Regions:
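Active-site neighborhoods and metal-handling regions in enzymes and metal-associated proteins
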Residues: 1-249
């Protein structure tokens, strides 16, 4: 809970800094300093992964701009332009627990399509969250997300999913953002996991860039993502990463 609140506070803090002309490395540095100095937390992505020939993730946040689906690496050469859509993904470790959350921002005025994709993607996340209660199944979550995305003529990325989270960053269960109702793991009180749909304006296919992390849409059309960390409660759910701006839950 404390880790979730800490992570959501980073997203609340960084919004005013997302402006045309800022680099994604500058956003990374602002978030890193805030996480470490203000919150006394650890940025979980920094040096995460590696092994199997993959380099560890070199930065403290993920910055995924426009057609980048997820895991964009902050760079001093990536300057935001007016109209750019950017997902900022924050994971912090507080007292051994992880809080993981992301949201979409716009540098200046986003395009009509980017704003619509972002809005529908956030709605997809909320539709998924609304399924969460003891006795529901993971397929119910995936189905709710997929149905809302596809009914708006968007597509669901299948290579990445939500995940169990607590003392481990990525744990079981795998929370797919597509599926059939009544299938998959049954939810039980006390389970904690993320719901983090990645929705594409075009086709769902993606590819990984040579940096081994950055995922982009194959057709170069826009992608959006929103994410919360939540827990199954006796009568539903509690979102650990809810922000004050949200009227949900």
């Amino acid at each position: 809970r404390a880790a979730g609140r800490a992570a959501s506070s980073v997203l609340e803090m960084i919004g005013e800094h997302v402006q045309p002309g800022v680099t994604t490395e500058e956003l990374n540095q602002i978030c890193h300093d805030y996480i470490v100095d203000k919150l006394d937390c650890i940025p979980a992505p920094l040096n995460y992964g590696g092994g199997g020939g993959q380099m560890p993730f070199p930065k403290s946040i993920c910055t995924s701009v426009n057609h980048v689906v997820c895991h964009g690496i902050p760079s001093s050469s990536k300057k935001l332009k007016n109209g750019d859509a950017i997902n900022i993904d924050i994971t912090v470790i507080k007292d051994g627990y992880h809080g993981d959350t992301s949201k979409m921002f716009f540098a200046g005025e986003g395009s009509v399509m980017a704003k619509r994709l972002s809005k529908i993607t956030q709605e997809c996340m909320y539709r998924g969250i609304e399924q969460v209660r003891p006795g529901a199944r993971l397929g119910d979550i995936g189905y709710a997300i997929q149905r809302h995305a596809e009914s708006n003529h968007f597509s669901v990325v299948r290579e990445f999913c939500g995940h169990g989270i607590a003392k481990v960053f990525h744990d079981d269960p795998q929370v797919l953002h597509y599926g059939r109702p009544g299938t998959g793991v049954m939810l039980e009180e006390g389970m904690s996991f993320t719901i983090e749909p990645m929705i594409n304006a075009g086709k769902r296919q993606i590819k990984i860039l040579p940096d081994q992390w950055t995922a982009v849409t194959k057709d170069h059309k826009l992608s959006a993502q929103w994410e919360h960390t939540l827990m199954v409660t006796a009568d539903g759910f509690e979102i650990f990463t809810l922000r004050t701006e949200e009227n949900f839950g």
